[in-house]
Amino acid sequence: MLGRKIPGSGVLGAGAGMDRGRTGERLHAALAGLQELHFLRDKQSAMVHWALTLNRDQPDPSKQENVSKEELRLEATLSLLKQQLTRLRRQDVGLKTHLQQLDQQITELKLDVCKASTEHLESDSRPSSGFYELSDGGSGSLSNSCTSVYSESLSSSSQTSLLPLLSTSYASHGRSSCGQTGVSRRCSADESTAQSDAPRSGVKLGSSLIRTATARADRARQRPVSTGDLDRMIGPGFGAFKSTDVKSSTPCSSPQNPSVDPKYQSNLVSSNGTEVYRYPSPLHAVALQSPIFSCTSDQGSSVALDEMPEEETQNLNEESTISSSVGYINKLLQRSSSRVNLLSSIKRIETVSGTHEQIPRSQEMIYGSLNGPQLLGSLQQLSMPLENALETGKTSALNNNQKQMDPPCLGSNFKEVEVQMLHHGKHPESSLDLQKNNFPINNTAGKVGAESDNGASEKRSGHFPKDLSVVQKPVERKSSFTSGREGSRASCHDKSSIPQSEFVHAQFVPAGSQRVKVRQADKKTKSVKLRKKSSEKPSAKKQHQKPLSREFCTKNRTDLKQSGSCRGKVTYLEESQAQSCSDCSCNGLINSHCIQNNHQQIPSSKSTKSRKAPEPVYHPLDHAKKKPSSRKWPSSSEIPLPPTLHTQRSKEMLNSRKVAMVRSVSARPRSGHWGCPPPRALPHSLSTSSYFSYLESRYPAAPVSSRHPPRCESEFSEYSAECASLFHSTIAASSDGEMSDYTTNRFGDSESSQGSQTASESDSSLSLDEEDLLEEEEEDEGGLVWAQAAMGTTAAGFSLQQHHRSESAACRIKASRALKKKIRRFQPASLKVMTLV
């Protein structure tokens, strides 16, 4: 009916013929798709049916197989038992002899141990190593351990001997699954377990654990199906589908569907190559029935349905992917090359139009943005010709100069510049600035290498000082960020030396004015008689010595202000003064004096001197001695002892002994109060101060009424003679110098305190004389020792103030036997020898 032509309509007949052909092709494609779907359905149903029958119908034959397998295992175990019995009989003979030898050795050892224990019971107390445990029978432990070790070796030997035998027995029965399949692959874990069940029972037998009932119970349970069984059993079932040709085994060969075009049994590939439908799949069948994949054979150029073999489709896919990747890479290369060309052209224009004014700014930019020496090394050769062109100002002849000097180097440099632009990535402008303005760095960093490489070194050597002077300004500006102190010192040197001299004088003034400042507080002191008596003799000396020190200070100041060539010396002195001031600043009072003298400087010291002229000089030491009587003891945290203090005080003691003065110069207790420990006990000064503070808290101070040192309240009690004899005997035997005077005066020995009364009356003046001698000796040394003298005087003043501040006015000691215990308990490290009687 469709093929019947309508009379009088030729055009319609031609169109109807074309439609008829198209519909016929669609129908054939739909038929092929339906047949493919039927084939897939049959294949899937066969797979499902096989899986169901595998789970349902297998138990009946498996029971029979299990029974036969159990019989075979029993036979194998019987044969193994026989073989093992023969081995055990052979091994028992050796075991018996070995055990007998061990028993003999154990008995011998036991006898030897018994003899040794009876003979050397008291002398030998070493712990035993634990190798021979003789506590539990002796012969039992070693024999048991030996049999256990031997049983383990026996079981291992039985394992190695039984495995090949079982494998041969299984091979003889024809139950080897690997041999059945004939596939040269390794057996899976389940196959190996299925074969090694009997050897495991043999192993159990080898280790004397024979179980026949449990083996049968294990065989009664069905082993689950695993991948090894599926691979072995499913392989032949599905091998028919895989091995047979799909085209020959399709239902198309049935008499109902005699003709099926083989072109519909190939893979479908779309025109753009993105979609591929493999033949035996439901998607392939559906795509055959759709009109999109219908074959338009009348239009030769446009073919919507491409029937190709698998190899051709794979090649087409590979070619499409390769072409797409190559096109993408080509696009990237074109973009990068165009960007590099554009940047290089801009770079050439900007390097021609660059001037000297851009150099300092670009120098800072380069310092901030340089990554490392690679950029310097790569742009070094390029920078020299550009720098020469900029120096001479002949911008028009830049290209000629570059070509004449080193054209290949320039070409390579431009390539390196392009590579660096690509390396910088998203910031080509910053890399352009680097490339444009890199010549100042290269002038400083790589000047020698660039001159040796290029030929016109004479011409450049004339221009280098200018560029270096231009470049050094930003370099100094940058170094001011990195090294701030050095830059500030350099700028101070360039400006003037006035602030340095003022700073030096401000640091130097506390050394001389500190005593003046302490002397100002003499009006508040109470012990006036002692101060007048003790200051009669040394006042003239001190007044004679003080103008010398003042002249020395003013002379140094004028020298520092006038001389401009000794700046390095001034800085060294400044550092030494700063060190001395920092050493003295650990004392709070001295630090406040330093701050005041920083602001007042010379006029303050003059005013204080004019204020104190009628009075005798240097009573502040006595004032400092009397002042701590009204305040509490400082704790150990309030008495810092810097290392310079130890050296200075030891130096004071050496100087005082050198002049043969009284030994209680600065460390022996003054009249009316007690001093710090002598310099020999400086490492233990913290412990002594804590000990004295403890005594002060236990026994409060008594008021001072005379210039004599206070004595114990219980001096005339019944135990005073005992205490005096105790301390005299210990001190005379174990101490010398200041230590004896200090301890006797400290613990209330009336005789020694009265004997040293004349010395203690003038000890203030002697301490001042000691300071004068120190200053004279240090001035004689010459050079830069005036700073050390300042440090010494401040340290000496600090030590004297520490003595008097850290001591109390009096200390009451109850003379009893508990005194010895307390002294022994709270004794400092320096008094251990004296109190341990």
Swiss-Prot record:
GO terms for biological process: mesoderm morphogenesis; negative regulation of nodal signaling pathway; Wnt signaling pathway. One of its GO terms (cellular component) is cytoplasm. Residues 189-265, 424-497, 512-564, 600-649, 738-782 are annotated as: Disordered. Keywords: Cell membrane, Coiled coil, Cytoplasm, Developmental protein, Endosome, Membrane, Nucleus, Wnt signaling pathway. Pfam families: Dapper. It comes from the Eukaryota. Residues 768-782 have a biased composition (Acidic residues). Residues 65-113 form a coiled coil. Transmembrane segments: none annotated. InterPro entries: Dapper. Its main location: cytoplasm. It is found in: Cytoplasm; Late endosome; Nucleus; Cell membrane. Signal peptide: none annotated. A motif (PDZ-binding) lies at residues 834-837. Residues 246-265, 432-445, 741-759 have a biased composition (Polar residues). Residues 456-466, 486-496, 548-560 have a biased composition (Basic and acidic residues). The C-terminal PDZ-binding motif may mediate interaction with the PDZ domains of DSH (Dishevelled) family proteins. Involved in regulation of intracellular signaling pathways during development. Specifically thought to play a role in canonical and/or non-canonical Wnt signaling pathways through interaction with DSH (Dishevelled) family proteins. Positive regulator of the Wnt signaling pathway which acts downstream of wnt1 indicative for non-canonical Wnt signaling. Also negatively regulates the Nodal signaling pathway, possibly by promoting the lysosomal degradation of Nodal receptors. Required for convergent extension movements in gastrulation. Interacts with dvl2. Belongs to the dapper family. This is Dapper homolog 2. It comes from Danio rerio. The gene is dact2.
